[in-house]
From Swiss-Prot:
This is Leu/Ile/Val-binding protein homolog 3. Component of an amino-acid transport system. The lineage of its organism: Bacteria, Pseudomonadati, Pseudomonadota, Alphaproteobacteria, Hyphomicrobiales. Residues 1-23 form the signal peptide. InterPro entries: Leu-bd, Leu_Ile_Val-bd, Peripla_BP_I. Gene3D superfamilies: 3.40.50.2300.
Length: 368
């Protein structure tokens, strides 16, 4: 066959494929699909997938089908940047993600530089939005806000208890722990011990000895379920009856699986239970049909897709991320599965809300 003709045919085929692909609105999902926090990444993946299925069944966005492109950050900043570059290289303009603040901050820089809008369902670190990037939004609150909720509870109910504060050295965990520490200090409680653990470590006996010596009755842990579950177990194995507190990093079922009955009574902050909001009805039904629990991160990811949809519809553009960001900053309410959202100029929720939850016999219940 004539090579020139073959090249022409191949080029035409490429153009045809590109046109077909362009007819879809592609949303990238950057999340830890592998690694130590993959359980949270799975929640985000399922929430985004379900939202897209519901949206497409209703006609898509501006009549165009929505498709998802997944990129695994493994909970590691370097891999997150690599995943972001992959998304940028594919010409994608919208992203749901990231899960952890430590990955979200460097990735947001890459996305901002390349005109990609991101909505994170779970990255709560203040540094993410404090830099004033126009393209960054959340469907969750900030660390300081949830830490203050738990601190307020401690100040009202445990002011006579000896409180220790521990973190995992990460942006999320340390930020959460430091915000909690500052809040209880302001309220008149001085921690009896402040320390850290290293992610991946299994033996916390030296730390437990220090906590026991300090007489800690309450241990606030800023970090995720793996280290939190081990710490809870080892505290109780050492004969301590200390109550463990934390943030949404302790909300995954793997926390209970690791800590076992030693995790009984653990208190943690998380977004208000969206399942009690009438606006969540359709999302809950769609998730239930797929046997997916309506967990907080799942619902936040579902809402993140809805936020992108609302921005595209307001901006009237499926590929101008700057126009979409401007539309989301307009202060008008956005109806989502987790309720009505509005955004501040930093991309934070104007009225975030947190509740305190408790691990009770392997189940999460609201604190009465």
């Amino acid at each position: 066959m004539n090579l020139k003709l073959l090249s022409s045919v191949a080029f035409a085929a490429t153009i045809g494929f590109a046109s077909a692909a362009y007819a879809d609105i592609t949303i990238g999902v950057i999340a830890p699909l592998t690694g130590p926090v993959a359980a949270f990444g799975d929640q985000v993946k399922k929430g985004a997938e379900t939202a897209v299925e519901v949206i497409n069944k209703a006609g898509g966005i501006k009549g165009e089908k929505v498709v998802l492109k997944f990129a695994d950050d493994a909970g590691e900043p370097k891999q997150g940047v690599s995943a972001a570059n992959q998304i940028v290289g594919d010409g994608i303009k919208f992203v749901v993600g990231l899960v952890t603040t430590g990955v979200a901050v460097p990735v947001s820089d890459v996305l901002s530089e390349n005109g990609v809008l991101m909505v994170t369902p779970t990255a709560t670190g203040p540094d993410l939005t404090a830099r004033g990037l126009e393209n960054v939004f959340r469907t969750c609150g900030r660390d300081g806000q949830q830490a203050e909720v738990m601190a307020d509870y401690v100040l009202k109910n445990m002011k006579d208890k000896k409180v220790a504060v521990i973190h995992d050295k990460g942006a999320y965990g340390k930020g959460l722990a430091d915000a909690f520490k500052a809040a209880i200090n302001k309220g008149g409680i001085t921690e009896v011990h402040y320390d850290s653990v290293t992610p991946g470590d299994k033996d916390f006996s030296a730390l437990v000895t220090k906590l026991k010596s300090a007489g800690a009755e309450v241990v606030y842990f800023g970090g995720y379920h793996a280290e939190g579950g081990l710490l809870s177990r080892q505290l109780h194995d050492a004969g301590m009856q200390a109550l463990v507190l934390g943030g949404e990093g302790l909300s995954n079922t793997e926390y209970w699986a690791i800590g076992g009955t030693n995790a009984q009574g653990t208190l943690f902050t998380n977004a208000k239970d969206a399942t009690k909001n009438p606006a969540a009805k359709d999302a809950i039904q769609a998730l239930k049909a797929k046997n997916i629990p309506a967990e907080a991160f799942t619902m936040n990811a579902y809402a993140a897709v809805e936020v992108i949809k609302a921005g595209i519809e307001r901006a009237g553009s499926t590929d101008d991320s700057a126009a979409v960001a401007k539309a989301l900053h307009d202060g008008k309410p956005i109806e989502t599965a987790i309720g009505t959202l509005t955004y501040s100029e930093t991309g934070d929720l104007s009225s975030p809300s947190f509740d305190i939850f408790k691990w009770d016999d392997g189940k999460i219940v609201g604190l009465e």
